[in-house]
């Protein structure tokens, strides 16, 4: 991709997933301030011709959630040495938790009073994970997640229920993306509801 009308850059492509995950874990985002950067000035277009790139390669922003939590976000296409670094780290007054999709079967947990993080390997004792992994050490992969997502969608349709994420969630994620883009242009905090 080289232009916004082709779908956008790193923020839309990668950032949308971590925004949705953050909203799921921490709640609605109130306001953002951010920057978008274009580090690669030209790319091959779909016809293999070099074309000026108008999209972001890297987007960094700070978000304030409605519950008072502050989060730092980054989406980048050109982080070399990392294949799938979609993840989060949440720290609080009594500990912290880390997740990275490259190691999607593990969580790292830090509890106050202990030195360092402990690794928790998901297994049969962690519901509903055990439905897919009958014994410790048998892990889910990315393609397994896609099968689970399709199953959730079909179950929701069969039971006349809404599954998550839905179109309303996608719209709310897009509002955050639009606010980051506006903040990058105007160089100031943007409230999500002001769009």
List where the protein language model places each region.
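C-terminal glycine/acidic-rich active-site capping loop/insertion
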Residues: 41-67, 88-89, 94-168, 190-195
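Solvent-exposed beta-strand sheet faces enriched in polar/charged residues
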Residues: 33-35, 74, 193
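Predominantly a Rossmann-like dinucleotide-binding segment in NAD(P)-dependent oxidoreductases
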Residues: 1-53, 107, 187
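Beta-strand scaffold of nucleotide-dependent catalytic cores
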Residues: 72-75, 99-100
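A general structural signal for well-ordered alpha-helical segments in protein cores
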Residues: 18-19, 147-151, 177
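Conserved loop-to-helix N-cap of the C-terminal "lid" that shapes the substrate pocket in Rossmann-like
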Residues: 11-15, 164-170
């Amino acid at each position: 991709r080289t232009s916004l009308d082709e779908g956008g850059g790193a923020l839309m492509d990668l950032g949308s997933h971590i925004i949705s995950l953050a909203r799921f874990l921490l709640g609605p985002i109130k306001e953002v301030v951010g920057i978008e950067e274009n580090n690669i000035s030209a790319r091959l277009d779909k016809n293999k011709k070099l074309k000026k790139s108008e999209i972001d390669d890297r987007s960094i922003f700070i978000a304030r959630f409605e519950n008072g939590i502050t989060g730092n976000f980054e989406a980048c296409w050109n982080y070399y040495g990392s294949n799938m670094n979609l993840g989060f780290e949440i720290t609080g007054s009594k500990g912290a938790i880390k997740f990275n999709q490259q190691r999607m079967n593990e969580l790292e947990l830090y509890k106050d009073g202990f030195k360092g993080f402990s690794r928790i390997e998901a297994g049969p004792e962690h519901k509903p994970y055990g439905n897919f992994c009958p014994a410790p050490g048998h892990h889910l992969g990315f393609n397994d997640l896609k099968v689970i997502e399709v199953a959730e969608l079909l179950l929701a349709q069969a039971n006349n229920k809404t599954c998550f994420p839905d179109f309303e969630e996608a719209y709310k994620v897009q509002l955050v993306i639009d606010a980051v883009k506006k903040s990058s242009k105007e160089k100031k905090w943007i409230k999500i509801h002001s769009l």
